[in-house]
Swiss-Prot record:
UniProt xrefs under PANTHER family: DNA-3-METHYLADENINE GLYCOSYLASE
SUPFAM superfamilies listed in its UniProt record: FMT C-terminal domain-like
InterPro entries with a match to the protein in the record: Formyl_transferase-like_C_sf, MPG, MPG_sf
Entry keywords, A to Z: DNA damage, DNA repair, Hydrolase
Gene3D superfamilies: Methylpurine-DNA glycosylase (MPG)
CDD domains: AAG
Alphabetized GO MF terms: alkylbase DNA N-glycosylase activity; DNA binding
Protein name: Putative 3-methyladenine DNA glycosylase
Pfam short name (any one): Pur_DNA_glyco
Biological processes, Gene Ontology terms: base-excision repair
Family: Belongs to the DNA glycosylase MPG family.
Length: 203
C-alpha cells in the first residue's frame, strides 16, 4: 500500500485513512477520527473551510501534493495539527487526523500529554494526537510512506464509519466531511463554531 491510494477525492481519502496505523517517535496508534478538506474555488472540491481555498502559498503548499505528505499547522498559534495530503499531485486537498487510539508506546504518550490524562484521551483531538506522537512543525512536508520518515503511515482495511459536520469551522459548516469509527471512546466531541450559520444554512 502506498501514497497513490490517496490520490483520490478528500472524502474518499478520509474513509481510506480511518483505521490506518500512524507511528511516530516511539508511539503507534490507529486513526479513529478524521476530517476531509478540499481546495480552491475553481478546483474539483471547492471548500471555503480549507486553508488552500484562497490559493497556494508558503503556508499551505503541502496541501497541493503529492499525496501522502504530512501537512502541519498550528491551531490558534498553539497546538500542532497533522493532515495527510490527498488528491492528484498539484490539486489541493487534505485529511485532518482528529483522533487516534494508542496501540503501543502508551507510557511515552502519557509522558508527553501528562500523567493525569486517561488512556482513551491521549490522542483525542488534533493537537493532542500530535503531542502524543511527538509530531512537530518540523515534520511538515515529510513523506508518510517513506520507511525512514520520523512519522509513518500504513493503510489498513477499510472500516464502517459514521459521518457528520466538521468541528469548529465557520464556512461549509454543514458538510458531513467528519468521519469516525463507531464505538470508539477516543473519538472527540462535536462542537459547532459560534461563527457558523445556523444548521441547514451552510453548505
Amino acid at each position: 500500500m502506498n501514497a497513490e491510494e490517496l490520490a483520490i477525492d478528500p472524502v474518499a481519502a478520509a474513509h481510506r485513512l480511518l483505521g490506518a496505523t500512524i507511528a511516530g517517535r516511539g508511539v503507534r496508534a490507529m486513526v479513529v477520527e478524521v476530517e476531509a478538506y478540499g481546495g480552491v474555488p475553481d478546483g474539483p472540491w471547492p471548500d471555503a473551510a480549507a486553508h488552500s481555498y484562497r490559493g497556494r502559498n508558503g503556508r499551505n503548499d503541502v496541501m497541493f501534493g503529492p499525496p501522502g505528505r504530512l501537512y502541519t499547522y498550528r491551531s490558534h498559534g498553539i497546538h500542532v495539527c497533522a493532515n495527510v495530503a490527498c488528491g492528484p499531485d498539484g490539486t489541493a486537498a487534505a485529511v485532518l487526523l482528529r483522533a487516534a487510539a494508542i496501540e503501543d508506546g502508551a507510557e511515552l504518550a502519557t509522558s508527553r500529554r501528562g500523567q493525569t490524562v486517561r488512556a482513551v484521551a491521549l490522542a483525542r483531538g488534533p493537537g493532542n494526537l500530535c503531542a502524543a506522537l511527538g509530531i512537530t512543525m518540523a515534520d511538515n512536508g515529510i513523506d508518510l510512506f517513506d520507511p525512514s520518515s520520523p512519522v509513518r503511515l500504513r493503510l489498513n482495511d477499510t472500516h464502517r464509519a459514521r459521518s457528520g459536520p466538521r468541528v469548529g469551522v465557520s464556512q461549509a459548516a454543514d458538510r458531513p466531511w467528519r468521519l469516525w469509527l463507531t464505538g470508539r471512546p477516543e473519538v472527540s466531541a462535536y462542537r459547532r463554531s459560534s461563527r457558523a450559520p445556523a444548521r441547514g444554512a451552510s453548505d
